[in-house]
Protein backbone atom coordinates (compact mmCIF):
# COMPACT_ATOMS: atom_id res chain seq x y z
CA UNK A 1 0.00 0.00 0.00
CA UNK A 2 2.73 2.45 0.98
CA UNK A 3 4.79 1.56 -2.08
CA UNK A 4 1.78 2.26 -4.32
CA UNK A 5 1.57 5.77 -2.88
CA UNK A 6 5.25 6.49 -3.51
CA UNK A 7 5.46 4.76 -6.91
CA UNK A 8 1.90 4.45 -8.27
CA UNK A 9 3.10 3.71 -11.79
CA UNK A 10 4.51 0.38 -10.66
CA UNK A 11 1.14 -1.03 -9.59
CA UNK A 12 -2.01 -1.66 -11.58
CA UNK A 13 -3.85 -3.40 -8.71
CA UNK A 14 -3.27 -4.27 -5.07
CA UNK A 15 -4.44 -7.37 -3.23
CA UNK A 16 -4.49 -6.84 0.52
CA UNK A 17 -4.78 -10.01 2.62
CA UNK A 18 -6.04 -9.33 6.15
CA UNK A 19 -4.85 -5.71 6.10
CA UNK A 20 -4.98 -3.13 8.85
CA UNK A 21 -3.78 0.46 8.87
CA UNK A 22 -3.36 0.20 12.66
CA UNK A 23 -3.76 -2.55 15.23
CA UNK A 24 -4.21 0.12 17.90
CA UNK A 25 -7.52 1.56 19.00
CA UNK A 26 -7.77 5.31 18.39
CA UNK A 27 -10.96 6.32 20.20
CA UNK A 28 -13.56 7.36 19.49
CA UNK A 29 -13.55 6.87 15.72
CA UNK A 30 -11.24 3.92 15.07
CA UNK A 31 -11.24 0.49 16.66
CA UNK A 32 -8.10 -1.35 15.57
CA UNK A 33 -8.67 -4.19 18.01
CA UNK A 34 -6.04 -3.53 20.69
CA UNK A 35 -5.33 -1.00 23.40
CA UNK A 36 -1.73 0.17 23.60
CA UNK A 37 -1.37 -1.43 27.06
CA UNK A 38 -2.38 -4.83 25.67
CA UNK A 39 0.23 -4.68 22.93
CA UNK A 40 2.88 -3.44 25.34
CA UNK A 41 2.04 -6.43 27.55
CA UNK A 42 2.45 -8.72 24.57
CA UNK A 43 5.86 -7.20 23.88
CA UNK A 44 6.84 -7.67 27.54
CA UNK A 45 5.87 -11.35 27.31
CA UNK A 46 8.01 -11.60 24.18
CA UNK A 47 11.00 -10.13 26.05
CA UNK A 48 10.54 -12.35 29.11
CA UNK A 49 9.64 -15.66 27.45
CA UNK A 50 9.97 -15.73 23.68
CA UNK A 51 8.88 -19.36 23.29
CA UNK A 52 5.92 -18.80 25.62
CA UNK A 53 5.01 -15.74 23.56
CA UNK A 54 5.14 -17.76 20.35
CA UNK A 55 3.05 -20.56 21.90
CA UNK A 56 0.45 -17.95 22.92
CA UNK A 57 0.47 -15.97 19.68
CA UNK A 58 0.56 -18.81 17.13
CA UNK A 59 -3.01 -20.08 17.76
CA UNK A 60 -4.22 -16.49 18.14
CA UNK A 61 -2.92 -15.68 14.66
CA UNK A 62 -3.97 -18.95 13.02
CA UNK A 63 -7.40 -19.03 14.66
CA UNK A 64 -6.92 -22.77 15.02
CA UNK A 65 -6.07 -25.29 17.72
CA UNK A 66 -2.52 -25.53 19.07
CA UNK A 67 -1.92 -28.83 17.23
CA UNK A 68 -3.26 -27.72 13.83
CA UNK A 69 -0.94 -27.65 10.82
CA UNK A 70 -1.10 -23.86 10.45
CA UNK A 71 -0.48 -23.21 14.15
CA UNK A 72 2.39 -25.70 14.14
CA UNK A 73 3.95 -23.89 11.14
CA UNK A 74 3.72 -20.59 13.01
CA UNK A 75 5.27 -22.06 16.14
CA UNK A 76 8.10 -23.58 14.09
CA UNK A 77 8.71 -20.31 12.24
CA UNK A 78 8.72 -18.30 15.46
CA UNK A 79 11.07 -20.85 17.00
CA UNK A 80 13.63 -20.41 14.22
CA UNK A 81 13.39 -16.61 14.07
CA UNK A 82 15.93 -14.49 15.93
CA UNK A 83 13.95 -12.94 18.83
CA UNK A 84 15.51 -9.52 18.14
CA UNK A 85 14.29 -9.60 14.56
CA UNK A 86 10.87 -10.87 15.64
CA UNK A 87 10.62 -8.05 18.18
CA UNK A 88 11.53 -5.41 15.60
CA UNK A 89 8.94 -6.83 13.20
CA UNK A 90 6.26 -7.04 15.91
CA UNK A 91 6.94 -3.48 17.04
CA UNK A 92 6.73 -2.17 13.47
CA UNK A 93 3.46 -4.02 12.85
CA UNK A 94 1.68 -3.58 16.17
CA UNK A 95 2.46 0.10 16.73
CA UNK A 96 2.26 1.48 13.18
CA UNK A 97 -0.48 3.94 12.32
CA UNK A 98 -1.05 4.28 8.60
CA UNK A 99 -4.65 5.51 8.72
CA UNK A 100 -3.71 8.81 7.07
CA UNK A 101 -2.08 6.93 4.20
CA UNK A 102 -5.21 4.97 3.29
CA UNK A 103 -6.90 7.88 1.50
CA UNK A 104 -3.72 8.52 -0.52
CA UNK A 105 -3.97 5.15 -2.28
CA UNK A 106 -5.24 5.59 -5.84
CA UNK A 107 -4.50 2.06 -7.06
CA UNK A 108 -7.53 -0.27 -7.27
CA UNK A 109 -7.53 -2.73 -4.34
CA UNK A 110 -9.01 -6.05 -3.40
CA UNK A 111 -9.39 -6.37 0.36
CA UNK A 112 -9.47 -10.00 1.49
CA UNK A 113 -10.95 -9.86 4.98
CA UNK A 114 -11.08 -12.91 7.24
CA UNK A 115 -14.53 -13.45 8.78
CA UNK A 116 -13.20 -14.50 12.20
CA UNK A 117 -9.83 -12.83 12.68
CA UNK A 118 -8.44 -12.38 16.21
CA UNK A 119 -6.05 -9.67 15.00
CA UNK A 120 -8.04 -7.71 12.42
CA UNK A 121 -11.79 -7.38 13.06
CA UNK A 122 -14.21 -7.26 10.11
CA UNK A 123 -14.82 -3.59 10.92
CA UNK A 124 -11.25 -2.88 9.77
CA UNK A 125 -11.94 -4.37 6.35
CA UNK A 126 -15.08 -2.24 6.18
CA UNK A 127 -13.10 0.84 7.25
CA UNK A 128 -10.54 0.22 4.52
CA UNK A 129 -13.25 -0.35 1.92
CA UNK A 130 -14.91 2.93 2.88
CA UNK A 131 -11.61 4.85 2.75
CA UNK A 132 -9.85 3.28 -0.24
CA UNK A 133 -11.17 5.08 -3.31
CA UNK A 134 -11.34 2.10 -5.67
CA UNK A 135 -11.69 -1.02 -3.56
CA UNK A 136 -13.60 -4.27 -3.39
CA UNK A 137 -14.16 -6.01 -0.07
CA UNK A 138 -14.27 -9.81 -0.17
CA UNK A 139 -15.11 -11.61 3.07
CA UNK A 140 -13.36 -14.97 3.36
CA UNK A 141 -15.33 -17.42 5.49
CA UNK A 142 -12.30 -18.46 7.53
CA UNK A 143 -10.97 -18.21 11.07
CA UNK A 144 -7.57 -16.75 11.77
CA UNK A 145 -5.39 -14.09 10.21
CA UNK A 146 -3.55 -16.06 7.53
CA UNK A 147 -5.93 -17.58 5.00
CA UNK A 148 -3.04 -17.68 2.53
CA UNK A 149 -1.62 -20.44 4.77
CA UNK A 150 -4.75 -22.14 6.12
CA UNK A 151 -7.01 -21.83 3.05
CA UNK A 152 -4.80 -20.95 0.07
CA UNK A 153 -7.43 -22.25 -2.38
CA UNK A 154 -9.92 -19.58 -1.23
CA UNK A 155 -7.31 -16.83 -1.47
CA UNK A 156 -6.18 -17.94 -4.92
CA UNK A 157 -9.77 -18.15 -6.15
CA UNK A 158 -10.56 -14.63 -4.91
CA UNK A 159 -7.35 -13.29 -6.43
CA UNK A 160 -8.01 -14.93 -9.81
CA UNK A 161 -11.56 -13.60 -9.84
CA UNK A 162 -10.38 -10.07 -9.06
CA UNK A 163 -7.56 -10.19 -11.60
CA UNK A 164 -9.87 -11.87 -14.13
CA UNK A 165 -7.45 -14.71 -14.84
Regions found by a protein language model. Give the residues of each.
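Catalytic active-site module of serine/aspartate enzymes centered on a nucleophile-bearing elbow/loop
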Residues: 134-165
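Residue-level signal for the nucleotide or nucleotide-sugar donor/cofactor binding architecture
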Residues: 81, 120, 147-150
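Hydrophobic "lid"/C-terminal helical patch
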Residues: 57, 90, 128, 155, ...
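Short beta-strand/loop motif that positions the catalytic acidic residue
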Residues: 105, 111-113, 117
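Short alpha-helix in the alpha/beta-hydrolase fold that links the catalytic acid
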Residues: 91, 98, 107, 121-130
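Flexible "cap/lid" loop of the alpha/beta hydrolase fold
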Residues: 1-48
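Active-site acidic short loop of glycosyltransferases
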Residues: 8-9, 106-107, 134, 165
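Conserved alpha/beta-hydrolase catalytic His-Asp/Glu region
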Residues: 25, 29-34, 44-103
Amino acid sequence: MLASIKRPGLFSKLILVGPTPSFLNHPPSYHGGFDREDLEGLMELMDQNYLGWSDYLAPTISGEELDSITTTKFRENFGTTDPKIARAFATACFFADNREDVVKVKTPCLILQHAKDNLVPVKIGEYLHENLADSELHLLDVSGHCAHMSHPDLVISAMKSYLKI
